[in-house]
Amino acid sequence: MNIAADIVGREAGPEPAAIDLRWLMAYNAALGEVSEAAHALFPVCYEWPANRTLRVASGLQALNERLVHAQHDLVIHRAPRAGETLQVAGRIVSVAQRRPGAFVVMRMQARGAAGDAVSTTDYGMLYRGVQLQGPTRAIEKAEDPPQHEAQLPPVGEIAVAATAAHVYTECARIWNPIHTE
């Protein structure tokens, strides 16, 4: 199995994402929080449709069983608000061969009605056992996270209900088998 290096630059969107209060509150509830404000990780919800569209358009969807969500760098420019419709676009910004497989980074960008930046995410996917056809390519810089200087000690345990994955999937509106199967 291969991923062609020439997928760099492929785009999807912009696609509209209508943010409603029910969605904001449901996402918070799935994480055990009670709030009407957008959770810091809520952007994954409105980015999901454009993410899927981009994977289909670039031929990556056929390799989903090999995909590991390996990296996630989210910049929040401002919080999304209930009642607004964002425009979400995605673009593949880099590909590289790594020892375990091909590594692909897509950049998701959400903008408000006035064109103002709401969030930017570099979403890194490792395709295990897949080879990159062609050289490493990048049209935008997407940095690896810094390495920890020391191993982090455990801080405790968190009980996770057997139904948590299903609740999260429904409340996030991210219907992805990785959460539930």
Stretch-by-stretch model annotation:
Residues 1-69, 132, 136-140, 147-181:
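Hot-dog-fold acyl-thioester-processing enzymes
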